[in-house]
Amino acid sequence: MVAEVKDGRIEFLSGNPNAPGMKTSLCARGVAGKALVEDDERLQQPLIRNGERGEGKWRAVSWEEALDYTAEKLKASIDQYGARSIALSDRGGPFRDFHRAFLRGLGSPNYCNHDSSCARNVHHANQSLTGLGRKDVAYDFKSARHVVLQLRNVFESIAVQEVNDLTDALDNGCKLTVIDIRASISATKADRFFLIRPGADYAFNLAVIHELLEKDLYDKAYADRYIQDLDALKAFAAQYTPAWAEAETGISASRITRFVEALAQDMPSVIWHPGWMTARYTNSFYICRSIYIINALLGSFGAKGGLPHVSKVGDVGRKDLKTFQELFPKPEEKRADGAGWLYPHFEQGPGLAHLLYKAMETQAPYPVKSYIAFRHDPLMGYPDPDHLKQIFDNLDLLVSITFTWCDTAWYADVVLPLSPYLERESLLGTKNALQPFFFIRRRALEPRFDTRAEWEIFSGLARRLGLDALAYDSIEDIWNFQLEGTGVNIEDFSETGLVNLSDKPRYPDRDNLKFNTPSGKIEIISKKLEDQGLPSLKPYESPARPQEGQFRLTFGRCAKHTQGHTVNNRALYELMDENVLWINDKEAEKLGIEDGDTVTVGRNGHTEKIKARVTEFIHPDGVFVVHGFGHTLPVESRAYGRGLADNRFMQGSLDKWDPAGGAMALQESFVTVKKG
């Protein structure tokens, strides 16, 4: 992003034209950065709770007092329960190294990101098949001939480069297929749209695999070279015909067959996107895995216009940024969430936050008593917030580090206000890509209020807890530490904000692909899964259908908001001030509901009101809302009481998760809808 500033105020914001695919574009959230900075309702100074949790009574304090208080509480937790009693979660991203180093320096293994409520299934699915993480392959949209979006809504859940690259591809003749329970904005741009029954995606994908194999439409030469256990896949898929899938999905066998034939014509430059937010159903892991299998059968892995392996910094003969985590030994303690030991098929790195919360509740395998939520709002992002509050009541310390009010901050003991991104600088970042690069974020403005950057907050805590290696006074010293040995200096970022590490994009040699599996191939049968008693190829089980008068509650994103973080932003509020309930027109007619009517949604005694959007373009089994609304904090005058919060209808869902992929199953709740 480029910010034009005059007299201490933002004049104009645009995308960085030097960043790949940006073309100076910004999404609505990016443009609304000016409104965020100018918002008087955002957090303005550190706060310490002065009443019961969630009561909204606060004592405004100095940074010295806030950091002293937090450090004393953390030290007390370490003294009584050990360093493993401290946990920290975030929303991921490229700037995590410093606060992860802080946690490691204390001696705790309990770092989690939000991914068990987002993309953990797709990550583990790729690992189980290719040994690669979800970010180890690129989506080469710009060169693709056919793109399939099933668990991804590119044109509403926006990454600007993806939108621009896919738009360019469509302009150049690329075909787009969308599979969804509703007609999203992405569906309006599609050549083919399949309106699928909620939860039946796996059936559709198995039928595609069946057709590719049964009719020899797959890339045989590629499969012979790179795919292991193909015979097992053929035997498994034999029963899952398009005719069988028609009864499960509501999509005709003939349409499935024609679609598969079209895919085969465009291989290997095909991208069947494996998904982004895949914490939806109890079989979402296998939906994601089946997508990766289809990509493998089409030869898309490693292909231009498909899923080429990204280049990491070392792959292009350069040295990566030095990390602060390397300053401290890896904690020997087992993770509280069980990732890597109780569940050896799960990657340890970002953990599984819902299982961390279970450990807070049960005190097993040991007590977790202090929790820092950094740019993370689990009370909005995870199901059943009332249950989660009961779990948080077991904590001795709950700290929220956030740039704006959120439910978790409102329930916290300490709130440490983070400067908005235009008012803070961050660590240098690395982008692994076809052409990898380093990038920098500098502050465009000095903070309006008494807020701080993340490095300032964690440096302050580190200094108080004896972690002198993290006690920095300037961001320049941090940047210089990171750049040691890279051959790059700070001045190299001045003109463009990034430093390319290779002279051009580098595609892998498709004749010499390497996969990070024991065999070096794509393994249909995963030993890690099988050793845990989990099938690599899971037989299909028909998803539950709603009872009479019920609907499966589904949710997603829109282009105007980022989860619940932006709903109180004045500029974005003016674009979209509340969510609405999508409901099928024929189902609405049965209930006497017309478009725009206020309806009551209910489940297990909990009800909320919302306006109905009556449309033929949603499957009759489901209803849909945009996630992030239904705010109840009086400090948010615009967001307060607007729309419905989907996660409050997911009572009991903290215990609903996919044992193969590790992520939550957030679309396994059924609700009633009535007029009024």
Where are these regions (language model features)?
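Conserved short loop/turn motifs at secondary-structure junctions
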Residues: S85-P94, E248-I251, G275-T282, V313-D315, ...
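Long, contiguous, secondary-structure-rich segments that constitute the structural scaffold
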Residues: A444, R448, R452-S502, A571-L581, ...
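Flexible glycine/proline-enriched surface loops and loop-helix/loop-strand junctions
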Residues: E52, Q150, K189-A190, Q239-W244, ...
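Flexible, glycine/charged-enriched surface loops at secondary-structure junctions
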Residues: Y81-S85, Y218-A223, S269-I271, G302-H309, ...
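N-terminal export/assembly segments and adjacent metallocofactor-ligating motifs
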Residues: M1-K215, Q239, S252, E589, ...
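Extended redox/cofactor-interaction regions of prokaryotic respiratory oxidoreductases
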Residues: H99-D168, N172-I179, Y202-L206, Y292-W410, ...
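N-terminal leader/propeptide and maturation segments of large enzyme subunits in energy/redox metabolism
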Residues: I48-E65, K215-A253, I372, R443-N516, ...
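Flexible glycine/proline-rich, aromatic-decorated loop/lid segments
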Residues: I185, C406-R441
